[in-house]
């Protein structure tokens, strides 16, 4: 079951949620995920494979082996605005961004040579539309 925040458009240029990490926007706004630890998150459908079936306002994230990784960099969570063949428009925030507000951003599909590492894992998953999955519990 996807978790959706229908008022996602209203988040643009609002002050960052919580401490400004990407997961804080999910934990603060998305019903059903508010306040829950990321350890409760599981990977649902791949966003790019599902395409337009992913509703506006759906919470998404990068996952490793079906779980949200607890690492300092290379993982990301956001809220979908629109899925297109070339990428995903999202509302998001991230810890090292100097802007004090939630932003609209396009996460694209990188060129084929830059999509995956030799072990099959996603290269730079935070900026690779292929690496995002719908958040489920």
Residue ranges and their predicted role:
Residues 1-77, 82:
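Secreted/periplasmic proteins that engage bacterial cell-wall peptidoglycan
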Residues 5-13, 81-137:
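Aromatic- and glycine-rich peptidoglycan recognition patches
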């Amino acid at each position: 079951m996807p978790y959706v925040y229908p008022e996602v458009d209203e988040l643009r240029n609002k002050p960052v949620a919580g401490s400004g990490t990407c997961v804080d926007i999910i934990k603060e706004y998305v019903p059903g995920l508010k306040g829950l630890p990321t350890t409760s998150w599981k990977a649902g459908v791949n966003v790019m494979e599902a395409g337009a079936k992913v509703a506006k306002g759906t919470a998404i994230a990068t996952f490793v082996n079906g779980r949200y990784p607890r690492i300092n960099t290379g993982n990301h969570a956001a809220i979908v605005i629109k899925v297109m063949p070339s990428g995903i428009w999202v509302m998001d925030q991230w810890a090292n961004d100097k802007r004090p507000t939630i932003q609209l951003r396009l996460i694209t599909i990188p060129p084929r040579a830059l999509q995956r590492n030799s072990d099959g894992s996603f290269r730079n998953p935070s900026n690779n539309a292929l690496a995002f999955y719908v958040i489920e519990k």
